[in-house]
Amino acid sequence: MSKQPDKQRKSQRRAPLHERHKQVRATLSADLREEYGQRNVRVNAGDTVEVLRGDFAGEEGEVINVDLDKAVIHVEDVTLEKTDGEEVPRPLDTSNVRVTDLDLEDEKREARLESEDDSA
């Protein structure tokens, strides 16, 4: 691993998809932090998040899409209006959101969260 910032950024941009999962993590709300014993979690579609920064700060909504290529998420009701009137989802960086509710339909995800709770 290089110390040079340019090479650091380059490796982040060119990371394969299985490594980009690490780039779409967001902090957990205080009650979820206490429940699961960890500070942040990978954001999945179906999770509920609160926007902390930007024009949409204070908005809360469900994650409708996670784009690993661009390392951004799309949240329902956080949209921009194009000049032709069409509403498009506003991409958000996961560092600007807080997870307030987890989608635990995936049993493996739930088991992983519980096991990390035991080790913490």
Swiss-Prot record:
The gene is rpl24. The keyword Cell membrane does not apply. SMART domains: KOW. Residues 1-26 are annotated as: Disordered. Keywords: Ribonucleoprotein, Ribosomal protein, RNA-binding, rRNA-binding. PROSITE patterns: RIBOSOMAL_L24 (PS01108). This is Large ribosomal subunit protein uL24. GO terms for molecular function: rRNA binding; structural constituent of ribosome. PANTHER family: 60S RIBOSOMAL PROTEIN L26 FAMILY MEMBER. The keyword tRNA processing does not apply. Residues 10-24 have a biased composition (Basic residues). Part of the 50S ribosomal subunit. Interacts weakly with protein L4. GO terms for cellular component: large ribosomal subunit. One of two assembly initiator proteins, it binds directly to the 5'-end of the 23S rRNA, where it nucleates assembly of the 50S subunit. Stabilizes the tertiary rRNA structure within the 23S rRNA domain (domain I) to which it binds. Located at the polypeptide exit tunnel on the outside of the subunit. The lineage of its organism: Archaea, Methanobacteriati, Methanobacteriota, Stenosarchaea group, Halobacteria.
